[in-house]
Amino acid sequence: MGVKGLNKLIKEHSPNAYKEYQLKNLFGRKVAIDASMCLYQFLISVRQSDGQQLTNDDGETTSHLSGIFYRTIKMVENNIKPVYVFDGKPPVLKGGELEKRLLRREEAQKQKDALKDEGTVEDHLKFEKRLVRVSREQNEEAKKLLELMGIPIVEAPCEAEAQCAELARGGKVYAAASEDMDTLCYEPPQLLRHLTFAEARKIPIDEISYKEAMAGLDMNKEQFVDLCILLGCDYCETIRGVGPVTAYKLIKEHGSLEKIVEWIEKGNTKYTVPENWPYAEARELFLNPEVKKASDISLKWKEPDVEGLIEYMVKGKGFSEDRIRSGAEKLKKGLKGGVQGRLDSFFTVVKKDDGKDKKRKSTAKDTKSKKQKK
């Protein structure tokens, strides 16, 4: 689900935290990708001309495999090395959010069924997309495909976003990539959004600097996590009626959720704290997530198993042999070259002197000269 209103809040208070660029600008980078999130995107966006998901002759959905295969190749062609991180078991606190998602899908199914032969094609597609979920089988299919492609995968013990952030903090990759803004709660040096979007959508990649975001918001990591819980996260409900502006104001004024709760319970406001609100437990999940240590993880990109890809994707899933072979050759070529060094890793950026700086230096020099003459 992410954190409601966080993106807008950071843009308002920390505009310097954002960079926008194209895929090619990530040349030479290693990136940890939230696999479940990108599979969900592919199931929604990779469609036939009639809006239906891609399927093979047996009626099996293949949108997720097509998306993973071609987008990964595009990254490798741009000298980017991706690693896909898969979710493990969800935290107990997330059970409520998962139940809500199930209820929303059931409601969408009822609304879709109610349309029957009525309504527009767009109406039917709208409800169909709300029904999308990534199944365990689709996760396993994606893992098998990535292994055949020679792309490393990591199975997180719990949340994939937390594991992506751990890999970035540990220096194994440059950034964590996910659409979920709550990834920032796990302190990745950089968060990439829209990385797995198709280039045809013409949506630039967003890079958010954690350090710059905290500087602009003027918060430490504990306060930032409390802000995200107050805005609304996957682990617990929030205080009804508190939006982004109010949430930010409350954290700045009181400093922590404990003090906000204390202030509310003294009757100083119209807000009501949810009964048995587990905000402290939610905070702990963000500050001390269950992850594999980056130092214990070895990431290796290997040469693709071309014949294995043909067997799995062509014979097993009904893809075009010519396209799979062509894609495999691009992958082979890209991975063989390795990640080339970036120019910014060899040079230190030096601030340029503008006209004013030169003028100031000249004035200072003249003043010093005059003093010496005296």
Swiss-Prot record:
Cofactor note: Binds 2 magnesium ions per subunit. They probably participate in the reaction catalyzed by the enzyme. May bind an additional third magnesium ion after substrate binding.
Chief site of localization: nucleus
Entry PTM: Phosphorylated. Phosphorylation upon DNA damage induces relocalization to the nuclear plasma.
Pfam families named among the record's database cross-references: XPG_I, XPG_N
Residues engaged in binding Mg(2+) 1: 34, 87, 159, 161
Binding site for DNA: 47, 71, 159, 232, 234
GO molecular function, one term: magnesium ion binding
Subcellular localization(s) per the UniProt record: Nucleus, Nucleolus; Nucleus, Nucleoplasm; Mitochondrion
Region (I-domain) location: 123-254
Stretch list, region Interaction with PCNA: 339-347
Cofactor(s), by name: Mg(2+)
Its biological purpose: Structure-specific nuclease with 5'-flap endonuclease and 5'-3' exonuclease activities involved in DNA replication and repair. During DNA replication, cleaves the 5'-overhanging flap structure that is generated by displacement synthesis when DNA polymerase encounters the 5'-end of a downstream Okazaki fragment. It enters the flap from the 5'-end and then tracks to cleave the flap base, leaving a nick for ligation. Also involved in the long patch base excision repair (LP-BER) pathway, by cleaving within the apurinic/apyrimidinic (AP) site-terminated flap.
HAMAP family for this protein: Fen
Protein's name in the database: Flap endonuclease 1
Upper taxonomic lineage: Eukaryota, Fungi, Dikarya, Ascomycota, Saccharomycotina
